[in-house]
Design a protein with these regions (language model features):
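Catalytic active-site module of serine/aspartate enzymes centered on a nucleophile-bearing elbow/loop
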Residues: 246-278
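Short beta-strand/loop motif that positions the catalytic acidic residue
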Residues: 217, 223-225, 229
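Conserved HGGG/HGGXW glycine-rich cap/lid loop of the alpha/beta-hydrolase fold
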Residues: 10-70
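Flexible "cap/lid" loop of the alpha/beta hydrolase fold
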Residues: 106-111, 115-155
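Conserved alpha/beta-hydrolase "nucleophile elbow" surrounding the catalytic nucleophile
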Residues: 31-33, 93, 97-102
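Conserved alpha/beta-hydrolase catalytic His-Asp/Glu region
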Residues: 128-140, 151-215
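Conserved acidic catalytic loop of the alpha/beta-hydrolase fold
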Residues: 76-93
Length: 278
C-alpha cells in the first residue's frame, strides 16, 4: 500500500495513503469531507488520459491514511500536503482542492507561499471563511450551526450522513442519472473516516479564516462553484474569493450542487483540463 510518512512536528506523525496514475506534469487532488481520494475517480481518468501524473491522497483521519487522535487543523493539513509533495519529489504542481480541501490549498499558500506550485483550483470550496461573525457577516454558518452539526455527527453518524449525501448531490434532481449505487459508494467512503476526524474537521472547515491565505495564493487560480450548492452556498464562499484574491477566475456552474464533479462531470472535467493545460 503506497504511503508517505509525515515529517513535520505540528501533530503526531502518521502515514498518508496516496495513489498515483499516469506520467507528465503533476496534479494533486485533495478530497472533501468526509470522503477520501476515491471521490476523484472521474477526474483521475480524464487527467491521466490527457497526459498528466495524477496524485490523489487521503487526508489524515480519512480513507486509508493514519487515524491520529489529534491534529485536525489546517496548519497540520497544509504541512501534511507539503510533506507529500516533498516525499514524492514533485514540482510545478497544480493543486486541486474540493470543499474542505480548498482549505488545504489556501493554508498551504499562507504557510509556504508558492513553493512547488504552478497553479491551483478551488472546487466547491469552503474558502474564504464560512463562519458568520461580526467581522464576517457574509459567512454561511453561525457558531451554533457548527456545533449542532458536530453533535448530530456524534449522536448518529450514519443517519446524519445519509441526509447529507442527498443534499451534497441534490439527489432529487440528479439521483436518476447517478443511480442508488452511487449513494452506496459514497457511504463506503464516509465510513473509512474516523469518528474523531469526522467531528473535528467540521470545526476546522467551518471556523478557519482563509482570507489572508488567499491573498498569498498568487499562482493562476481557478474557482468552480455550483449555484445550487446546498452544503457550501456560492454566495458565502466561491463568489467571495475574488475579493481576497483578485487574480481568481470564477466559474459558476448553473444548476450544479456541491458534488458537481460527480453530477456534472463532463462540464467540470472540461473546465479543469482547460485550466491545467495553461
Amino acid at each position: 500500500m503506497p504511503t508517505i510518512q509525515t515529517k513535520h512536528t505540528l501533530a503526531p506523525q502518521t502515514e498518508l495513503y496516496y495513489e498515483t496514475y499516469g506520467e507528465g506534469r503533476p496534479v494533486v487532488l485533495i478530497h472533501g469531507w468526509p470522503l477520501s481520494g476515491r471521490m476523484w475517480e472521474g477526474q483521475i481518468d480524464a487527467l491521466r488520459h490527457a497526459g498528466y501524473q495524477v496524485i490523489s491522497y487521503d487526508r489524515r483521519g480519512f480513507g486509508q491514511s493514519g487515524k491520529t487522535a489529534t491534529g485536525y487543523t489546517y496548519d497540520v493539513f497544509a504541512s501534511d500536503l507539503k510533506d507529500l509533495i516533498e516525499a514524492l519529489k514533485l514540482n510545478d504542481v497544480t493543486v486541486v482542492g474540493f470543499s474542505m480541501g480548498g482549505g488545504e490549498v489556501s493554508r498551504y499558500a499562507g504557510l509556504f507561499g508558492m513553493q512547488y506550485l504552478r497553479s491551483a483550483a478551488l472546487i466547491s470550496s469552503v474558502a474564504p471563511y464560512l463562519l458568520k461573525t461580526e467581522g464576517n457577516p457574509d459567512g454561511g454558518m453561525a457558531e451554533a450551526d457548527v456545533e449542532g452539526m458536530v453533535q448530530q455527527v456524534a449522536a448518529n453518524r450514519p443517519q446524519f450522513l445519509a441526509g447529507f449525501t442527498k443534499k451534497f448531490l441534490n439527489w432529487d434532481e440528479n439521483g436518476s442519472k447517478l443511480g442508488d449505487e452511487f449513494l452506496d459508494f459514497t457511504a463506503s467512503l464516509y465510513f473509512q473516516a474516523s469518528p474523531v476526524a469526522t467531528q473535528e474537521c467540521v470545526r476546522a472547515f467551518a471556523m478557519t479564516d482563509f482570507r489572508a491565505d488567499l491573498a498569498k495564493l498568487t499562482v493562476p487560480l481557478l474557482v468552480v462553484h455550483g449555484d445550487a450548492d446546498q452544503i457550501v452556498p456560492l454566495e458565502a464562499s466561491g463568489q467571495r474569493v475574488p475579493q481576497y484574491q483578485p487574480n481568481a477566475e470564477l466559474h459558476v456552474m448553473k444548476g450544479a450542487p456541491h458534488g458537481l464533479n460527480a453530477t456534472h462531470a463532463e462540464e467540470f472535467n472540461k473546465l479543469l483540463l482547460d485550466f491545467v493545460a495553461r
